[in-house]
Amino acid sequence: MSKPFVSVIIAALNEEEAIANVINAVPKNLAGEIVVVDNGSTDRTAEVASAAGARVVKETIPGYGRAFRAGLRSISPQCEIVVFLDGDGSDCPEMMDRLVTPIIEGRTDFVIGSRTQGNRERGSMNFHQVLAGYTIGFILRILYGVHSTDMGPFRAIRRDTLEKLKLREETYGWPLEMQMRAARAHVRTMEVPVDYRRRAGGHSKIAGTLRGSVLAATRILITLARIAVQRN
């Protein structure tokens, strides 16, 4: 039985200090390709990522979901499993096997890395981020009867499953849209604990400022309401 082709998509915005280490930590025995989406960086993120062996895709219009969608448009036709993570060094790519193996073994189609269930470095997540994960999980349980403890960016999903979800969100609500549409479609989903670190340099686009936190929270709430009332 041949090993499925895995595409790793990394979203990055001004992450020149961290991106090389993130790329180097991706298990090369699992990843068929590594795509870094440069979402409008003004530093050397693209050059550093390319030098580290990743294929760089430019998406100049800001948007977390938009960046990942740009990455999806550029992945290999061979891709069967897609892994998503951030380029700031907070996720642990070396734990990718925890996400990919259950899919390869046919036990599930969608795996979410739960930061709240893993080991979190002090200061890596603010209280409101942890609370938001559990609150959204509570709402998802009420709406769809699914168990969820986090909306973490580090996740893996079968490509054909992802394409059927028809994601549209272009902002920080993108991970939540994926989870909500997967729940509504009764996609086989599981969580696995993953470790989480403080970012390696740069500044957080969400937790780094009050404005960023408020904007992200607002976008997530809008996404929650929009998907909850949609029929398709």
Model-derived regions, located:
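A conserved acidic beta->alpha catalytic loop
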Residues: 38-46, 89
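Cell-envelope/extracellular polymer assembly enzymes that use nucleotide-activated donors
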Residues: 5-7, 177
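Conserved donor nucleotide-binding strand/loop of the catalytic core
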Residues: 32-35, 46-74
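Acceptor/aglycone-binding surface of glycosyltransferases and processive sugar-polymer synthases
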Residues: 60-74, 93-172, 199-215, 221
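Short, well-formed alpha-helical segments that are part of the catalytic scaffolds
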Residues: 14-28
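Catalytic donor-sugar/metal-binding loop of nucleotide-sugar-dependent glycosyltransferases
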Residues: 146, 168-170, 180-197
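Short beta-strand/loop segment that forms part of the nucleotide-sugar
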Residues: 10, 22-23, 31-40
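Short beta-strand-to-loop acidic/aromatic patch adjacent to the donor-nucleotide binding site
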Residues: 79-90
